[in-house]
Amino acid sequence: AAAATQAVPAPNQQPEVFYNQIFINNEWHDAVSKKTFPTVNPSTGEVICQVAAGDKEDVDRAVKAARAAFQLGSPWRRMDASDRGRLLNRLADLIERDRTYLAALETLDNGKPYVISYLVDLDMVLKCLRYYAGWADKYHGKTIPIDGDFFSYTRHEPVGVCGQIIPWNFPLLMQAAKLGPALATGNVVVMKVAEQTPLTALYVANLTKEAGFPPGVVNVVPGFGPTAGAAIASHEDVDKVAFTGSTEVGHLIQVAAGRSNLKKVTLELGGKSPNIIVSDADMDWAVEQAHFALFFNQGQCCGAGSRTFVQEDVYAEFVERSVARAKSRVVGNPFDSQTEQGPQVDETQFNKVLGYIKSGKEEGAKLLCGGGAAADRGYFIQPTVFGDVQDGMTIAKEEIFGPVMQILKFKTIEEVVGRANNSKYGLAAAVFTKDLDKANYLSQALQAGTVWINCYDVFGAQSPFGGYKMSGNGRELGEYGLQAYTEVKTVTIKVPQKNS
């Protein structure tokens, strides 16, 4: 890690903001209402700049631009699939050119450590866009041997105008994961970026213009969920909506889609993912990975390993070592290369997490370390570990989205399966064991869209991610991620004579 850190270029800790308006038709606009909102540096609580506050009227303008770009005969609809791939590769090249700037801007607006922004987030952004660039001319239909004198085949056609609503925890990465499959398959996009972290997505919007995407293909509207987000979800001329965020808002989006034009919906929502430490696990590795599973990204991961189930005969040792690791975690200025943990994204999240810590103490969980603010200013929270957590406690059931680890004890594999699955969520799960039979059994028994064995938070552009139950609908990334962005059309032609 130290060697990798040395390879990271020094950041500008005060990166200039070039774009803070609404991006429609490859042009920058103020909000129709002229309203703005502040975006804040979570390390200091200070305002970085004002950003145009998009609302229903701005979404309407963006949808009109997108619909015009999607008309039959338009440059985008007439473009060869291979050229769509070329544009995505060009976009990735431009992001790579500006990688140092974008990583610094992400850290300024989001608070995540700059080294992570540069090495993890930006790396995955590039891989994701290039992966989908490769799919552009390879995701196609089939010819079908239908009975009779007919020729039948399928076409994979773009869905059309895609509303995409992205969260604040991985702004650049979530933007790439949604733009990649949508643009590779020929769709047009109206994207609503999180009000907490709009700056990097707006910069990338300008790069889509520089890359050569035609006007109206990519439109980006900063704004709030109840206004701009709701306008997208309920819009009669949006063909599909994709949302990443809380399960609570996911409900609202699915309802709005149903009440309007029954647009297609994909949702990647919350989680309370179980991380199961079997007694035969490699203890050094399990402790470090369980720490990473929960504390990575300030605990602000939908798939965080937020219920750490530890088999009883290694429970005491695991707890002791996990507390020591949490106490050694370096919290501080995210631009410092030694920092492991920056601030929570904003004051709302900061207070929410502290509220969950209070609840854990009140309900009888054992606070083993942390438990409070970690600085006099900014939204920093101490790495916190609770032991003796019971399944019925609020901190064991609800998504905290912060640096708060819950450790629970279990006896048997059968018992832990039932407890792990006793959740409204089903996003991810993990198992640490050297026993292949236990790993295999648990990978099948756990109700989760992703199961990691002897690892955690391993993502690839090639592997799909999504949830069971109330963790969402559909999958993102991988070949599976293309399905939500295409309509399958069957074409059948009468022929004089069919031969094999």
Curated annotation (Swiss-Prot):
<dbReference type="InterPro" id="IPR016161">
    <property type="entry name" value="Ald_DH/histidinol_DH"/>
</dbReference>
<dbReference type="GO" id="GO:0106435">
    <property type="term" value="F:carboxylesterase activity"/>
</dbReference>
<dbReference type="GO" id="GO:1905627">
    <property type="term" value="P:regulation of serotonin biosynthetic process"/>
</dbReference>
<comment type="pathway">
    <text>Alcohol metabolism; ethanol degradation; acetate from ethanol: step 2/2.</text>
</comment>
<feature type="modified residue" description="N6-acetyllysine">
    <location>
        <position position="142"/>
    </location>
</feature>
<dbReference type="GO" id="GO:0004029">
    <property type="term" value="F:aldehyde dehydrogenase (NAD+) activity"/>
</dbReference>
<comment type="function">
    <text>Required for clearance of cellular formaldehyde, a cytotoxic and carcinogenic metabolite that induces DNA damage.</text>
</comment>
<dbReference type="Pfam" id="PF00171">
    <property type="entry name" value="Aldedh"/>
</dbReference>
<feature type="modified residue" description="N6-acetyllysine">
    <location>
        <position position="358"/>
    </location>
</feature>
<dbReference type="GO" id="GO:0005759">
    <property type="term" value="C:mitochondrial matrix"/>
</dbReference>
<feature type="binding site">
    <location>
        <begin position="245"/>
        <end position="250"/>
    </location>
    <ligand>
        <name>NAD(+)</name>
    </ligand>
</feature>
<feature type="modified residue" description="N6-acetyllysine">
    <location>
        <position position="424"/>
    </location>
</feature>
<feature type="modified residue" description="N6-acetyllysine">
    <location>
        <position position="366"/>
    </location>
</feature>
<dbReference type="GO" id="GO:0018937">
    <property type="term" value="P:nitroglycerin metabolic process"/>
</dbReference>
<dbReference type="GO" id="GO:0008957">
    <property type="term" value="F:phenylacetaldehyde dehydrogenase (NAD+) activity"/>
</dbReference>
<feature type="modified residue" description="N6-acetyllysine">
    <location>
        <position position="434"/>
    </location>
</feature>
<dbReference type="GO" id="GO:1903179">
    <property type="term" value="P:regulation of dopamine biosynthetic process"/>
</dbReference>
<keyword id="KW-0520">NAD</keyword>
<keyword id="KW-0007">Acetylation</keyword>
<feature type="modified residue" description="N6-acetyllysine">
    <location>
        <position position="35"/>
    </location>
</feature>
<keyword id="KW-0496">Mitochondrion</keyword>
<feature type="active site" description="Proton acceptor">
    <location>
        <position position="268"/>
    </location>
</feature>
<dbReference type="GO" id="GO:0006068">
    <property type="term" value="P:ethanol catabolic process"/>
</dbReference>
<comment type="subunit">
    <text>Homotetramer.</text>
</comment>
<dbReference type="InterPro" id="IPR016160">
    <property type="entry name" value="Ald_DH_CS_CYS"/>
</dbReference>
<feature type="active site" description="Nucleophile">
    <location>
        <position position="302"/>
    </location>
</feature>
<dbReference type="GO" id="GO:0046185">
    <property type="term" value="P:aldehyde catabolic process"/>
</dbReference>
<dbReference type="GO" id="GO:0005739">
    <property type="term" value="C:mitochondrion"/>
</dbReference>
<dbReference type="GO" id="GO:0051287">
    <property type="term" value="F:NAD binding"/>
</dbReference>
<keyword id="KW-0832">Ubl conjugation</keyword>
<keyword id="KW-0560">Oxidoreductase</keyword>
<feature type="modified residue" description="N6-acetyllysine">
    <location>
        <position position="56"/>
    </location>
</feature>
<feature type="site" description="Transition state stabilizer">
    <location>
        <position position="169"/>
    </location>
</feature>
<feature type="modified residue" description="N6-acetyllysine">
    <location>
        <position position="411"/>
    </location>
</feature>
<dbReference type="InterPro" id="IPR016162">
    <property type="entry name" value="Ald_DH_N"/>
</dbReference>
<dbReference type="InterPro" id="IPR015590">
    <property type="entry name" value="Aldehyde_DH_dom"/>
</dbReference>
<protein>
    <recommendedName>
        <fullName>Aldehyde dehydrogenase, mitochondrial</fullName>
        <ecNumber>1.2.1.3</ecNumber>
    </recommendedName>
</protein>
<feature type="modified residue" description="N6-acetyllysine">
    <location>
        <position position="409"/>
    </location>
</feature>
<dbReference type="InterPro" id="IPR016163">
    <property type="entry name" value="Ald_DH_C"/>
</dbReference>
<comment type="similarity">
    <text>Belongs to the aldehyde dehydrogenase family.</text>
</comment>
<dbReference type="InterPro" id="IPR029510">
    <property type="entry name" value="Ald_DH_CS_GLU"/>
</dbReference>
